[in-house]
Amino acid sequence: MTTTPAPERAETEAMIAEVLSQYPKKAAKFRAKHLKANDPEGSKECEVKSNIKSRPGVMTIRGCAYAGSKGVVWGPVKDMVTISHGPVGCGQYSWATRRNYAHGHLGVDNFTAMQITTDFQEKDIVFGGDPKLEQGLDEIVELFPLAKGISVQSECPIGLIGDDIEAVARVSSRLDIPVMRVRCEGFRGVSQSLGHHIANDAVRDHVLGTGGDSFEQTDYDVALIGDYNIGGDAWASRRILEEMGLRVIAQWSGDGTINEMASTHLSKLNLIHCYRSMNYICTTMEERFGTPWTEFNFFGPTKIISSMRKIAEFFDDEIKAKNRAAIAGYQRCVDEITKAFRPRLEGKRVMLAVGPAPRHTIGSYEDLGMEVVGTAAEFAHRDDYTGPTACSKEGTGLYDDPSRVFELEEVAKRPDLIGSGPKEKYIFQKMGTPIEPYHGVDGFAIFARDMARHQQPGLDLLEAPWSKAGEVA
């Protein structure tokens, strides 16, 4: 595979101009605010507009507020049953593509992979769905006696017809189990980002600080915030922290429990992975309980080691000494990996297309000598772009809320490889572009191996059945 030269601002701006030229004048003016070439100096002309309504007709792939609450924040809590209050389709779509791993027995004390819904029908729209929800809550308690809580996630019809889920949840206090009601109807806000905020508010109002002093505390207790254990990444983070000598008392919310969430205020430090979805609760705990928090990044050795050092600064000399020993062990490992794979990947071009601004993963590619030439985000806010601006080089393309049908297809022609999330990946898979996500020190070895493997032109050697002569059987 031939590697194309490094990007420059003029090249990126020319590509953006070509994309915008395909739009009507008014739409082009609107989209021009969302497509920019990166300027490390942060000039006003290169500021990316974000977190505003998508243009009608632009085929956005944003999620909704319901997906942000149910699919991201509440769904991964393993000992809570999440019930989607509304039609069956929303719950299935929001959960079918996520791999939130969790310990436990499915359907006994782990409910993360279960799709439970009130299955709204037309008559429920006409007559109201409160009785159906109350019946559903009764059935959950009967079927899953080891469940520690229930979260009710509202879909669009609930808000449109004005069902009072708060009243139903209060009536269900007789069930002797906490019932969290979350007003996360999909039409609220401009993307799933508002769903994150609504879910954080529900945790703040109904869960945070309710856990008692049920365990012996130490000076080294930390909480993992905004790590949803997709593919087991929270477990990789936990291993690193434990090798530093720290004790993880709570995971929010991948492989986490409601009791952990209720007791997180006892943590000495909150470590936030996904800033966009959980910064709200971290600032709340800082204001209410005085708990400090910091972002961390365990993607790629450079960022891992930098984050380990930053975290260690919050603790005493014992933790700092253990941290230095852990880093020394990791360094030998990653040096061998980099030596083996960097020569094969040097200069390859990558585009990252995910939900929030992809500032976490840029370092992994750069550690292998690859160059990130574009970053696309669906629900980033203005402050999210300070990450890519700081990490990305001059001329890197920044694409906010890109159109699935046209914009992503055009900018995807530029790189050698695409890194993407579960919603974005399908279009790139159909285009024959390889994609993989990895996390942690152990994951870096697999990441490097597979990045090299994906550069083999295997797909170019295959012929699609419909391109052959004759009919497909």
Swiss-Prot record:
Cofactors, names only: [8Fe-7S] cluster; [7Fe-Mo-9S-C-homocitryl] cluster
UniProt binding sites for [7Fe-Mo-9S-C-homocitryl] cluster: C274
Keyword field contains Nucleotide-binding: yes
UniProt: [8Fe-7S] cluster binding residues: C64, C90, C156
GO cellular component: molybdenum-iron nitrogenase complex
Catalysed reactions, as listed in the record: N2 + 8 reduced [2Fe-2S]-[ferredoxin] + 16 ATP + 16 H2O = H2 + 8 oxidized [2Fe-2S]-[ferredoxin] + 2 NH4(+) + 16 ADP + 16 phosphate + 6 H(+)
Cofactor note: Binds 1 [8Fe-7S] cluster per heterodimer. Binds 1 [7Fe-Mo-9S-C-homocitryl] cluster per subunit.
UniProtKB keywords: ATP-binding, Iron, Iron-sulfur, Metal-binding, Molybdenum, Nitrogen fixation, Nucleotide-binding, Oxidoreductase
InterPro entries for this protein: Nase/OxRdtase_comp1, Nase_comp1_asu, Nase_comp1_CS, Nase_Mo-Fe_asu
GO molecular function, one term: nitrogenase activity
GO biological process: nitrogen fixation
The enzyme's E.C. designation: 1.18.6.1
Job description of the protein: This molybdenum-iron protein is part of the nitrogenase complex that catalyzes the key enzymatic reactions in nitrogen fixation.
Subunit structure as annotated in this protein's UniProt entry: Tetramer of two alpha and two beta chains. Forms complex with the iron protein (nitrogenase component 2).
Family listed: Belongs to the NifD/NifK/NifE/NifN family.
This protein's name: Nitrogenase molybdenum-iron protein alpha chain
UniProt organism field: Frankia alni
Lineage of the organism: Bacteria, Bacillati, Actinomycetota, Actinomycetes, Frankiales
